[in-house]
Amino acid sequence: MSIDLDWDGMINSDEIDVAEWLRSLLDKQFQQLDLPRNIRSVSITTLSLGTIPPELEIKHISDPFPEFYAEEEAAADSHYLPPLHPPQQRRSAPSTPHIHTNTTNPIDRGIASYFHPLGSAPLMSGLRTPLNIPSWATNGHTRTSSRLPLNTPIEAEIVESVRESTAPRTPEEREQQPVPEDREDDLQVLFRVKYTGDIRIGVEATLRLNYPSDDVVLLPMKLHLSHININSLAIMAYIKKSIYLSVICDLDDSDHAVARTGRERLDIIRDVKIDSEIGHHDTNGAALRNVGKVDRFIVDKIRSLLKAEIAWPSWIKVSMEDEDSDDEEGEEEGDQEDEH
């Protein structure tokens, strides 16, 4: 089932500047990178989402993975739901403070129960918008009916073959694993995302020549990334007014999973065009253009960053809670304490 996105309404929303949010997120992550000695101060200066939306095709709908509930319980214990977790916290649970990265073991077969077989009872009756996301992210209709007896093949085998085992391994871990509440609004969507749009990203940095000698020369460097190509299988879960997003694997031109293991199964960005410029072009016209080694370094770092941030078993979480409602809840709790 394909989804029609109101791309213009999404990127021009009054609620949030999506392009600036993404630019700021990427820029903060680049500030934390270990750069080569001859490159310093990399920053993301501009980001335009363009006018061409990604193509989204729903493959399957199921209950959310239990790992997402582990984070929900951890967040509930701390009485704080941040809009976006940093990488080291994203996979944290009360009993598992670090990311499990067992790349040799396949997914526990028990996880397959989270993929409902075709022909079962409707999984999302009365769905109005995909994932119940805000109205600015969709134009309110899809190309099929709102009830979803799926007729497309389930990609369960792909997920089982690439998803690293994060199921509890000991009786103690199983006892500590949170039991998901029976919330009928919770759901998870497995979908293909294909993008060949006109997003543009501007990057600036400083190149150090003759480093570390005393005669070091500093040259400004500008890069413009465009023609980004993505074709991946991803999951998006909606749990208690929070959205979780993780990329499972890359797909080839026939929409088959790329046969790789571990995080190497993912590039996320299949192809990208880079226009680079090094030097002070505006002063003496002596700028160097399209320096291949620097270009490749930037692309490799962006791919590594994306894999660390959103490739399973990592994910990003975006809270859809209204700040006003949070303030009201806090005031109500304060009033109750005053009464006692």
Curated annotation (Swiss-Prot):
Q: Which GO terms describe its biological process?
A: mitochondrial genome maintenance; mitochondrion-endoplasmic reticulum membrane tethering; phospholipid transport; protein insertion into mitochondrial outer membrane
**Protein function:** Component of the ERMES/MDM complex, which serves as a molecular tether to connect the endoplasmic reticulum (ER) and mitochondria. Components of this complex are involved in the control of mitochondrial shape and protein biogenesis, and function in nonvesicular lipid trafficking between the ER and mitochondria. MDM12 is required for the interaction of the ER-resident membrane protein MMM1 and the outer mitochondrial membrane-resident beta-barrel protein MDM10.
Q: Which proteins does it associate with, and in what oligomeric form? A: Component of the ER-mitochondria encounter structure (ERMES) or MDM complex, composed of MMM1, MDM10, MDM12 and MDM34. A MMM1 homodimer associates with one molecule of MDM12 on each side in a pairwise head-to-tail manner, and the SMP-LTD domains of MMM1 and MDM12 generate a continuous hydrophobic tunnel for phospholipid trafficking.
Question: Which PROSITE patterns does the UniProt entry name for this protein?
Answer: SMP
Signal peptide start-end: none
Record bears the keyword Lipid biosynthesis: no
Domain of life where this protein originates: Eukaryota
Q: Specify the protein name.
A: Mitochondrial distribution and morphology protein 12
Organism (species): Yarrowia lipolytica (strain CLIB 122 / E 150)
Q: What ranges does the record list as Polar residues composition bias?
A: 89-106
Extract the coiled-coil ranges from the record: none
Subcellular locations according to the entry: Mitochondrion outer membrane; Endoplasmic reticulum membrane
**What InterPro entries does the database record attribute to this sequence?**
Mdm12 (IPR027532), SMP_LBD (IPR031468)
Any idea which GO molecular function terms this record carries? lipid binding
